[in-house]
Amino acid sequence: MKVVIAPDSFKESLTAKQVSEAIKSGLSRVWQDAEFVTVPVADGGEGTVQSLIDATEGEQVFVTVKGPIGNDVEAFYGILGDGETAVIEMAEASGLHLVPSEQRDPKNTSSFGTGQLILNALDRGIQRLIIGLGGSATNDGGTGMLAALGVKFLDSDGQPITPNGGGLVELASIDVSGLDARLAGCEVLVACDVDNPLCGEKGASAIFGPQKGATPADVELLDSALSKYGELTEQVTGKHVLTQKGAGAAGGMGAALLGYLPARLKPGIEIVLETVKLAEHVADADIVFTGEGRIDHQTVHGKTPMGVAKVAKEYGLPVIALAGCTGDNFQAVYECGIDAVFVCVPRAMSLPEALEEAEVNLANLAENVARLWQLPR
């Protein structure tokens, strides 16, 4: 019997690897002769780098970079087990969590540090980049990142502007002659789960600006600046970024990646599952386990359990999801490939208790599911 275990993390409690091991521990009490394959995964958001490192036996690389407001921050990215692929989360270097709430202002934040992470990966000979968007503090159109990679953004006097949201107001021309030539030989995959355009009422500034500290006046200013940036980008690169779906992701970082790098945007879960080769693992399996901290009506929208179930169902396999809790209309997952959902909280308990005991409770739940599976049918 071959069992594949491919869960996401239980946020604020267990990493995806810890969840995988807990489920394996419980199942092995009953299925003692089974072959277990653990594949910790993520949906392209928080925890993706660590999950891919764990799944491929890769390594962390720590780098001191410039944070969103210019201070030094210690960030990391992952080099996967193949030694050729780097996984970078934008939030590591340019995340909103790096900016104190009283200093949050997307006119003043820059994605420069994300560019420094990419540069470090190139210096290590990386040929394939996976870049996760989301959680950014920026609305600079990715100009900070591009500046770190050699692009010059100039005002009407030919002087460099500050590559942040506010600096874009002064943008008059773009010089790409210094863009790092090594990027042309790289494969760049961007984990992106939003389809917002760069500008307009559904654009980066209007939709994501307020949560980063933008006032209504700021939104208008930033949107206008991104529009001019988009026009110049199209002139310089010949690529249509103003109306491209996903260009507005992460404060316009999507536009920078699509315009200046050989990038392709894909749903995060698809990139992750392809990278960990989940299909190869489940092709000859008998049952698949997945899960996440909370399963509810949102789970069907590109979350890990749905991605895992989709792959498993291509091979006609049963899929069991284990969760910390369920929410409204969690039954929606039953229409999308998951056959049963089980919750690991064994009694009434506080949230701190549930988080602290999650590993033990999850293992016990997995054991009970295996025992149930053993019953004559």
Protein language model features and the residues they cover:
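N-terminal loops that bind phosphate or other acidic moieties
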Residues: 1-133, 137-377
